[in-house]
C-alpha cells in the first residue's frame, strides 16, 4: 500500500472519529493521540489530504452543529456549550460570534442564517 493510501485511510478514520466525538472537547493533542501521529505530522497530513487545517475543521464542524441545533431546537445556549465541550457559555458565545458574526441568541431569533459558513462533514474523498 502506498504512503498516499495509508495517509488517506488515516485521515478518513480521523474524520469519522471527529464526527463521532463532536460533542466532547477535541483538542489537537487528543486527536493526534488518537491517530498515533505527532500533532505536527497529523496537522500536515490532514491539510494535505483535505485542504483544511485540522483545528479550523474541528471548530467549523462544531459551529455548524451548534448553528443547526439553534435553528432546530430550543435547547439553552448553556446546554449547547456544555454539550459541545466549551468551558462556558461565554466561550461558546465568543467563538460563535467570531465565526458567524452574530451571537447565538440573535442567530436563533433571526431569519438570516449563516449556512454559507457551514462546514459539512468531510467523508471519504469528498474534500
Curated annotation (Swiss-Prot):
Domain called HTH araC/xylS-type: residue spans: 12-110
A single GO molecular function term of this UniProt record: bacterial-type RNA polymerase holo enzyme binding
Induction profile: Induced by salicylic acid, which leads to significant reduction in the expression of flagellar genes, including fliC.
Record has Repressor as a keyword: yes
Keyword Zinc: no
A GO BP annotation: response to antibiotic
Residues within the DNA-binding region(s): 29-50, 77-100
Record SMART domains: HTH_ARAC (SM00342)
One GO cellular component term noted in the UniProt record for this chain: cytosol
The entry's keywords: Activator, Antibiotic resistance, DNA-binding, Repeat, Repressor, Transcription, Transcription regulation
Highest taxon, organism lineage: Bacteria
SUPFAM superfamilies per the UniProt record, alphabetical: Homeodomain-like
Pfam families membership: HTH_18
Subunit relationships: Monomer.
Function: Transcriptional regulator. Represses transcription of genes belonging to the flagellar regulon, including flhD, flhB and fliC; probably thereby leading to repression of motility. Binds to regulatory regions of target genes, including the promoter of the flhDC operon. Represses expression of the flhDC operon in a post-transcriptional manner. May activate genes involved in the multiple antibiotic resistance (Mar) phenotype.
The protein, known as: Multiple antibiotic resistance protein MarA
Naturally occurring in which organism (per UniProt): Salmonella typhimurium (strain LT2 / SGSC1412 / ATCC 700720)
Amino acid at each position: 500500500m502506498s504512503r498516499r493510501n495509508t495517509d488517506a485511510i488515516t485521515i478518513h478514520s480521523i474524520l469519522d472519529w471527529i464526527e463521532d466525538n463532536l460533542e466532547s472537547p477535541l483538542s489537537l493533542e487528543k486527536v493526534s493521540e488518537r491517530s498515533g501521529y505527532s500533532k505536527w505530522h497529523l496537522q500536515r497530513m490532514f491539510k494535505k489530504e483535505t485542504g483544511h487545517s485540522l483545528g479550523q475543521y474541528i471548530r467549523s464542524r462544531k459551529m455548524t452543529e451548534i448553528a443547526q441545533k439553534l435553528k432546530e431546537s430550543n435547547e439553552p445556549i448553556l446546554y449547547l456549550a456544555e454539550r459541545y465541550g466549551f468551558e462556558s457559555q461565554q466561550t461558546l458565545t465568543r467563538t460563535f460570534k467570531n465565526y458567524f458574526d452574530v451571537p447565538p441568541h440573535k442567530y436563533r431569533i433571526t431569519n438570516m442564517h449563516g449556512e454559507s459558513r457551514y462546514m459539512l462533514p468531510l467523508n471519504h474523498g469528498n474534500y
